[in-house]
C-alpha cells in the first residue's frame, strides 16, 4: 500500500504545469470505440488507473488495444459481450460498455459497478434510457443484462434528471439505432461534447451537444477515425487552487478557459488575478489576500461538484467564511473531518459546509476517501506546517496523472512511499 509523504512549507507553489486529457471524456470515448468496426486512434489520453482498467476490459471483450503515445483500438474482433466483476468492481464507468455492446451486437452485460464512496449513483437512468430505445434489461446475479431483437429504435427521451453518465449511455447507443433519437434534459458537460465529437469523427450524426437537447440520427455502421481528448478542467482547477491557497503564481498549459468559467469566476472573486489565452490559464496570488467565497454545486455550466473539495480548502485558508452547498451528491464532505485533523475550521449542516478563518494547518496523518477529496488533502499537506501522510492514495491515481511529479515541479516536497518504509 502506497502513501504520500509531504513536507509542508510556506513557500508558494509556482511555475508551469501541463494539463492532461480529461478522464471523464477519455473513459466514455474508449468505451464508445466498441461501436466502431474499424480502428480508432485516441490521443491525449491520461495515464490513470481507470484508463488502464478500461483498456484491459476492451481487450477482454476481444478488441485489440495498444498504447504508443495515443491509444489505438480495433474493436472489429469483439467476441465477448460481458464486462466481468473482477475487472469492473472498482470502476463505476464500466456501465458505459453496455450501450455500445447492445447497440452494435444486440446484447451485453456489465457487472454492477463500484467506484468512489460518495453516495448513491444508481444505474437506473442508464437502464431506463436503453429501455426507451427498445432494449430489454434484466438485473441478474449482480449483472445488468441488455438485449435487443434487431436494432435499437430511435425515441424521444426526456431524462428524469440531469445525468452525465446516462446522457453518454443513451447518446452512444442511439448512434446505431434505427431512426432519430431526441434526448431532452441532457447533461451539458464539456466531456459530453467531446464524446459526441468523437462519435461524429467515426461517422455518427450527433448534434446539439452542449445544450440540453441532443439529437442523434442513427446510422447503420460506424467506421474508424482519430480524436484528441479535451483538456481536464478539474485537474486545471485543482492546480489553480493549489497556487491560490499557497500564494503562488502558476501557468496551466494545454487547457481551455471556456471549460471552467464558473471556477475561474470564483477564483477571481476570491482575490486571484486570472489571465487566459488560447491554450493556457494563469493565476497570480502574489501579495494578494485570499477571500472566502460562497459555492453552490450544480450541473454544468454551473460550479462543478468535482471542484467542491478543493474550494472547501480554499475557504478554510481564506479571510472570512464561505458557505458551500453540495447539491449533486450526498455524503461528499468526507474530506472535512480529515482537514479538521490538520487544524481546519468548518461546520457541516446537511448538504452545507461553512468554513473559513483557519489560522494555519499542521501536518497530520489523513485518509483519502474519494478522488477529489484526496486532492484537497494533498494540497493541504503542501501548505501545512510539518509532515503530512496521506493514506489510500489509490483514489488519487484514479483521476490525476502524475500529480506528485507536477506538484514537485511547482516546488512541493512530496513523495510516494510504501507503508513499510514509514
Swiss-Prot record:
Q: Where does UDP-N-acetyl-alpha-D-glucosamine bind?
A: 92, 121-125, 161-164, 306, 328
Q: Name one GO cellular component term.
A: cytoplasm
Catalytic site positions: 116
Q: Does the keyword Cytoplasm apply?
A: yes
Cite the annotated pathway: Cell wall biogenesis; peptidoglycan biosynthesis
Q: What is its main location?
A: cytoplasm
Q: What are this entry's molecular-function GO terms?
A: UDP-N-acetylglucosamine 1-carboxyvinyltransferase activity
Residues recorded as binding phosphoenolpyruvate, renumbered to this chain, are 23-24
For the keyword Cell cycle, the answer is yes
Subcellular localization: Cytoplasm
The organism's superkingdom is given as Bacteria
**Where 2-(S-cysteinyl)pyruvic acid O-phosphothioketal occurs, residue numbers?**
116
GO BP terms: namely: cell division; cell wall organization; peptidoglycan biosynthetic process; regulation of cell shape; UDP-N-acetylgalactosamine biosynthetic process
Q: Which UniProt keywords apply?
A: Cell cycle, Cell division, Cell shape, Cell wall biogenesis/degradation, Cytoplasm, Peptidoglycan synthesis, Pyruvate, Transferase
Q: What is its EC number?
A: 2.5.1.7
One Pfam family from the record: EPSP_synthase
Q: Which family does it belong to?
A: Belongs to the EPSP synthase family. MurA subfamily.
Tell me, in a sentence or two, what this protein's role is: Cell wall formation. Adds enolpyruvyl to UDP-N-acetylglucosamine.
Alphabetical list of HAMAP family matching this protein = MurA
Q: Which PANTHER family match?
A: UDP-N-ACETYLGLUCOSAMINE 1-CARBOXYVINYLTRANSFERASE
The name this protein goes by in its record: UDP-N-acetylglucosamine 1-carboxyvinyltransferase
Q: Which organism is it from?
A: Aliivibrio fischeri (strain ATCC 700601 / ES114) (Vibrio fischeri)
Amino acid at each position: 500500500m502506497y502513501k504520500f509523504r509531504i513536507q509542508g512549507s510556506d513557500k508558494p507553489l509556482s511555475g508551469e504545469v501541463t494539463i492532461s486529457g480529461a478522464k471523464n471524456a477519455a473513459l466514455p470515448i474508449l468505451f464508445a470505440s466498441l461501436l466502431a468496426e474499424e480502428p480508432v486512434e485516441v490521443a491525449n489520453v491520461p495515464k490513470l488507473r481507470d484508463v488502464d482498467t478500461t483498456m484491459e476490459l476492451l481487450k477482454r471483450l476481444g478488441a485489440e488495444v495498444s498504447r504508443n503515445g495515443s491509444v489505438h483500438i480495433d474493436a472489429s474482433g469483439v467476441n465477448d459481450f460481458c464486462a466481468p466483476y473482477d475487472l469492473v468492481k472498482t470502476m463505476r464507468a464500466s456501465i458505459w460498455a453496455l450501450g455500445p455492446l447492445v447497440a452494435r451486437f444486440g446484447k451485453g452485460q456489465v457487472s454492477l459497478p463500484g467506484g468512489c464512496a460518495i453516495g448513491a449513483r444508481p444505474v437506473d437512468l442508464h437502464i431506463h434510457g436503453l429501455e426507451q430505445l427498445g432494449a430489454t434489461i434484466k438485473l441478474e446475479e449482480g449483472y445488468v443484462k441488455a438485449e435487443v431483437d434487431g436494432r435499437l429504435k430511435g425515441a424521444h427521451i426526456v431524462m428524469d434528471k440531469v445525468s452525465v453518465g446516462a446522457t453518454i449511455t443513451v447518446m452512444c447507443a442511439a448512434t446505431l439505432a434505427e431512426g432519430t433519437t431526441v434526448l431532452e434534459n441532457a447533461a451539458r458537460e464539456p466531456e459530453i461534447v467531446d464524446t459526441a465529437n468523437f462519435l461524429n469523427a467515426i461517422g455518427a450524426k450527433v448534434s446539439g451537444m452542449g445544450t440540453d437537447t441532443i439529437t442523434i440520427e442513427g446510422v447503420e455502421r460506424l467506421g474508424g477515425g482519430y480524436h484528441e481528448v479535451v483538456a481536464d478542467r478539474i485537474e486545471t482547477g485543482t492546480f489553480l487552487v493549489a497556487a491560490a491557497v499557497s500564494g503562488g503564481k502558476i501557468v496551466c498549459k494545454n487547457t481551455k478557459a471556456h471549460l471552467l468559467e464558473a471556477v475561474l469566476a470564483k477564483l477571481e472573486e476570491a482575490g486571484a488575478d486570472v489571465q487566459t489565452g488560447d491554450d493556457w490559464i494563469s493565476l497570480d496570488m502574489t501579495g494578494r489576500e485570499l477571500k472566502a467565497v460562497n459555492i453552490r454545486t450544480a450541473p454544468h455550466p454551473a460550479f462543478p461538484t468535482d471542484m467542491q473539495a478543493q474550494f472547501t480548502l480554499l475557504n478554510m485558508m481564506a479571510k472570512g467564511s464561505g458557505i458551500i452547498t453540495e447539491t449533486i451528491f450526498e455524503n461528499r464532505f468526507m474530506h472535512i473531518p480529515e482537514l479538521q485533523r490538520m487544524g481546519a475550521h468548518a461546520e457541516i449542516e446537511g448538504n452545507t459546509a461553512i468554513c473559513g478563518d483557519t489560522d494555519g494547518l499542521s501536518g497530520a496523518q489523513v485518509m483519502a476517501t474519494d478522488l477529489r477529496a484526496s486532492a484537497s488533502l494533498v494540497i493541504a499537506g503542501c501548505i501545512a506546517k510539518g509532515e503530512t501522510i496521506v493514506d489510500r492514495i489509490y483514489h488519487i491515481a484514479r483521476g490525476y496523472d502524475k500529480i506528485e511529479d507536477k506538484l514537485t515541479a511547482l516546488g512541493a516536497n512530496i513523495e510516494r512511499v510504501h507503508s513499510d518504509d514509514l
